[in-house]
Amino acid sequence: KEYNVRRAFEAGWGGVVWKTLGSEGPPIVNVSGPRYGAIWGADRRLLGLNNIELITDRPLEINLREIKTIKRDFPDRAVVVSLMVPCEEAAWKAILPLIEETEADGVELNFGCPHGMAERGMGSAVGQVPEYVEMVTRWVKQNSRLPCIVKLTPNISDICQPAEAAKRGGADA
């Protein structure tokens, strides 16, 4: 949200990755209770955390307006917009110009989320198939001037394969 990013930038942060945006479609319903779960070891030491939040449930147009306002007010700070849309070229072609209009500094392709969105053919459902990673990354690079960061899923046996696919597709990072 603009409020949170503004507070961060006023505190001196140099950049942010905006919460993952999606295209218009079936509504996203996030949980209203605790968003994180703890994984405890046998000795009750904290081993890790797991979140259960999906992509933003806020309308795309509100996020785009807020990103544009933040970039106007903080032109020297980096704003990378995280994206997760269906694995269809038309969906990526439609959203990329909207992101460019905000003056964002880059896009992150969210191929990592293992829950909630994989059932819709997004997130880790893309990140687990190197051919999809390469294909979508290439679409983004062909249709946008923005630097492209590919966020991969850890839910795969060999992360090198999708990483190499992202590189072949033209990812900047």
Model-derived features: where do they sit?
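N-terminal capping/small domains of soluble enzymes
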Residues: 1-80, 84-89, 93
